[in-house]
Amino acid sequence: IRCFITPDVTSQACPDGQNICYTKTWCDNFCGMRGKRVDLGCAATCPTVKPGVDIKCCSTDNCNPFPTRERS
């Protein structure tokens, strides 16, 4: 499977055994100005996250593009 990987947001082949792409988003101190922080990558299973962190997992090539920021 191929997933987008941060920080470069390039499509890369995942290591053997990692067949899930994820998009993790959360707010830091600059959320109001910059929007949510985004982490993209590969995983063997969908990661569990802390409260306040959103995660989306998928299992097709390049299914985790960088999310577009919602304009307020």
UniProtKB/Swiss-Prot annotation:
Disulfide bonds join C3-C21, C14-C42, C27-C31, C46-C57, C58-C63. Keywords: Acetylcholine receptor inhibiting toxin, Disulfide bond, Ion channel impairing toxin, Neurotoxin, Postsynaptic neurotoxin, Secreted, Toxin. Expressed by the venom gland. One of its GO terms (cellular component) is extracellular region. It is found in: Secreted. It comes from the Eukaryota. GO terms for molecular function: acetylcholine receptor inhibitor activity; ion channel regulator activity; toxin activity. Belongs to the three-finger toxin family. Long-chain subfamily. Type II alpha-neurotoxin sub-subfamily. Binds with high affinity to muscular (alpha-1/CHRNA1) and neuronal (alpha-7/CHRNA7) nicotinic acetylcholine receptor (nAChR) and inhibits acetylcholine from binding to the receptor, thereby impairing neuromuscular and neuronal transmission. This is Long neurotoxin 1.
